[in-house]
From Swiss-Prot:
It comes from Staphylococcus aureus (strain JH9). The gene is purL. ATP binds at Y57, K96, D495, G532. Its EC number is 6.3.5.3. Its main location: cytoplasm. This is Phosphoribosylformylglycinamidine synthase subunit PurL. One of its GO terms (cellular component) is cytoplasm. InterPro entries: PRibForGlyAmidine_synth_PurL, PurL_linker, PurM-like_C_dom, PurM-like_C_sf, PurM-like_N, PurM-like_N_sf.
Length: 729
């Protein structure tokens, strides 16, 4: 008789306990078919988390198959803890992005902190030392006190974990829209570097080899966290606060260093982070990859308190834990290492040849499941989408007040400087950061070399809602341009797909179309997808977020010497590369004036992106350019203002465009500053101005003139978010 009081198999079926765990009637019946019997309480819980949307991608797997995943530089693609890409000299870059949206909505500090901790462990589990962190965040508008609280908590959580563990946060992006009220998006990315011969895989093989648990003792925090992340947020979600994990960055630091030492041991067979679904996913996935079985003796698992049941142990998402498989007879070597780092560890099982996932506690069997169906045979749902009949009529922008529009956009939190927030992050711990958070991608030197890794993270929402297919192309191209802007060669990307409920036809269609656009852009821009994450059911009280695919992209700089004087100077000439058209669908101007997305859209020419990108990258590396800025949110006038304010330089510009086109967000444009005495030879580059040593920012068109003090612009741009967060109702 079990020492733990749990529902019987009959109660699970009759009272439909499995539904509370997230399994549908059909999924429960499939579990019964796989087992040839009704599952017990622990087995039901295990299937529920492994077949959750968060772990199985059961609604998104068909779309993910569209993405190109191989390429010249790819060493390891999707399927492991993170992607691995060659950077030459027997070195590789390891990177991935993950979401922690639902936990951050309920407990913003811990939700964000554990999101950072989890993505760090994904990188470390491959054997790489992390070199930088990035994040992509979405919140509701800041005139709402709840959104202010969420923003403050998330930023504090990101900084609190990253700063303590000693990894710089070097880049990110934050946008604000009422569609994220109560449902923030917190996507964390980590980048690491490794030598080829140290790359690890999450595999369990070799009959008789031992399974070692290391890290924090298992508690009851985070139970069913993967299931919680696969549901819509409702008024009852607050009661699921225990589903939010608790992070400990100081233990995280110890675990990181111990793991990086453990990978140097030849006796290590495989290693995986205990992330979503905790011990269940890490152990069963390792067994599946190794084509093996596992027997875990759960009484050996280090626990925080007595009485924790097998069900709770297997579903707990206690943070700062790793699972290792080591060669039999060499266990003590690893246990001694972990003891040296003051970490709890234990041998909790062994690899078998049964192809079954067996869990016992004091010799009583609590689960006996075939490995392959559990890990690889979750149901895949192909639903029906519904093409929306978009209104594509043109809005009227002919009578806008340029000055008023300029200042309203400049101080909107989406466009305003994020330094007030980023200053809470340690940006240079480790002393290898070359370009910090600001106007373009971050650049971090590869220690001991003259190489550097450029990284960026970018998301699109209004554009994707505007036209999912074109928006999907745009988000990949935006990341590509940001790497080009620092002279890097884009190598590969990771993605996080943040959407509402796929069971709604319109949202399912958004997934179909946007991933098709992303895949096309990846193919043409030669940026294969090597890792990623899907976060669905981002809805609050029945209202979906905007479809928000996020792309993290890395690039290689073979020699950083050209960055020594890569900063705009007085006397540099400004050029605009790329045509400016009447493109306002999904823009900040459209939001400011009309509020709703009108669905007028442009078609992105990906081939021209490559041509412009190569020309600009060459000009940077030849030392012709002192700065490159992509034209983004708010359009050309806002881009020029940010350039002027960020560097404290005067600017004088004359541009032959209309008033509205000052705020057009036509894709594929760059503003470049050419060093004094240098000549730029790029097709269709138009000289538009000069950087000066005055405090004057002056932009003239045939129809208007803006003339303001740079210091005033800087004060408004840099102070806007702080003002929003300190304003009382």
């Amino acid at each position: 008789m079990s020492k733990f009081i749990e529902p019987s198999v009959e109660e699970i079926k009759l009272e439909k306990v499995y539904q509370d765990m997230g399994l549908s009637d059909q999924e429960y019946e499939k579990v019964c078919d796989i087992l040839g019997r009704q599952p017990n309480f622990t087995e039901t819980g295990i299937f529920s988390v492994m077949w959750s949307e968060h772990c199985s991608y059961k609604h998104s797997k068909p779309f993910l198959k569209q993405f190109p995943t191989s390429g010249e530089h790819v060493l390891m693609g999707p399927g492991e803890g993170a992607g691995v890409v060659d950077i030459g000299d027997n070195q590789a870059v390891v990177f991935k992005v993950e979401s922690h949206n639902h936990p951050s909505a309920i407990e913003p500090y811990q939700g964000a902190a554990t999101g950072v901790g989890g993505i760090i462990r994904d990188i470390v589990s491959i054997g790489a030392r992390p070199i930088n962190l990035l994040n992509s965040l979405r919140f509701g508008e800041l005139d709402n006190k709840q959104n202010q609280r969420l923003l403050k908590g998330v930023v504090k959580g990101i900084g609190g974990y990253g700063n303590c563990i000693g990894i710089p946060t070097t880049a990110g992006e934050i946008e604000f829209d009422e569609r994220y009220d109560g449902n923030p998006l917190v996507n964390a990315m980590c980048v690491g570097v490794i030598n080829h011969d140290m790359i690890q895989k999450g595999t369990a093989k070799g009959v008789g080899n031992s399974v070692i648990y290391v890290g924090l003792k298992t508690g009851r925090d985070g139970i069913h966290g993967a299931t919680f992340a696969s549901e819509e947020l409702t008024e009852e979600s607050e009661s699921k606060r225990p589903s939010v994990q608790i992070g400990d960055p100081f233990v995280g630091k110890k675990l990181m260093e111990a793991t990086l030492e453990a990978i140097t041991f030849d006796e290590l067979v495989g290693i995986q982070d205990m992330g979503a679904a905790g011990l269940t996913s890490s152990s069963s996935e390792m067994a599946a990859k190794g084509g093996s079985g596992l027997h875990l003796r759960l009484e050996q698992v280090p626990t925080r308190e007595p009485g924790i049941s097998p069900y709770e142990m297997m579903l707990s998402e206690t943070q700062e834990r790793m699972l290792l498989v080591v060669e039999k007879g060499n266990e003590q070597k690893f246990l001694d290492l972990f003891d040296k780092h003051e970490l709890d560890s234990a041998v909790i099982g062994e690899v078998t040849d049964t192809n079954r996932f067996v869990l016992t506690y004091d010799d009583e069997v609590y689960a006996d499941i075939p490995v392959e169906p559990l890990a690889d045979e979750a149901p895949v749902y192909i639903l029906e989408g519904e093409e929306k009949d978009y209104n594509t009529s043109k809005n009227d922008y002919t009578h806008i007040d340029v000055k008023d529009t300029f200042f309203k956009l400049l101080k909107h939190p989406t466009i305003a400087s994020k330094h007030y927030l980023y200053d809470q992050y340690d940006q240079q711990v480790g002393a290898n950061t070359i370009i910090k958070p600001g106007l373009q991608a971050s650049v971090v030197r590869v220690e001991g070399t003259n190489k550097a890794i450029a990284s960026t993270i970018d998301g699109e929402a209004r554009y994707v809602y505007n036209n999912p297919y074109e928006g999907g192309k745009m988000v990949v191209a935006e990341a590509y341009r940001n790497l080009i802007a620092v002279g890097a060669t884009p190598l590969a990307m990771t993605d996080c797909l943040n959407y509402g409920s796929p069971e709604k036809k319109e949202i399912y269609q958004q997934l179909i179309d946007s991933t098709k656009g992303m895949a096309e852009a990846c193919d043409i821009l030669k940026t294969p997808v090597v890792s990623g994450n899907v976060s669905l059911y981002n809805e609050t009280k029945g209202t979906s977020i905007f479809p928000t695919p996020v792309v993290g992209m890395v690039g290689l700089i073979e020699n950083v010497n050209y960055l020594n004087d890569f900063e705009p100077q007085v006397g540099d000439k400004l050029y605009l590369i790329g045509d400016t058209k009447d493109d306002f669908g999904g823009s900040q101007l459209e939001k400011l004036i009309y509020g709703k997305v009108n669905h007028e859209f442009e078609s992105l020419d990906l081939s021209s992106e490559v041509e412009k990108g190569e020309s600009i990258k060459t000009a940077i590396r030849e030392g012709l350019l002192s700065h490159v800025q992509t034209v983004g949110k708010g359009g050309l006038l806002i881009t020029l203002a940010k350039l002027s304010a960020h560097y404290g330089l005067g600017l004088k510009s004359s541009i032959d465009i209309t008033n509205a086109q000052l705020f057009s967000e036509t894709q594929g444009r760059y503003v470049v500053s050419v060093k004094s005495g240098k000549t730029l030879n790029i097709d269709n580059a138009i000289e538009i101005g000069l950087l000066t040593d005055s405090d004057n920012f002056k932009v003239t068109t045939p129809y208007t003139e803006i003339s303001e003090n740079v210091s005033d612009i800087k004060q408004i741009w840099e102070g806007a978010i702080a003002q929003c967060l300190t304003t009382q109702d």
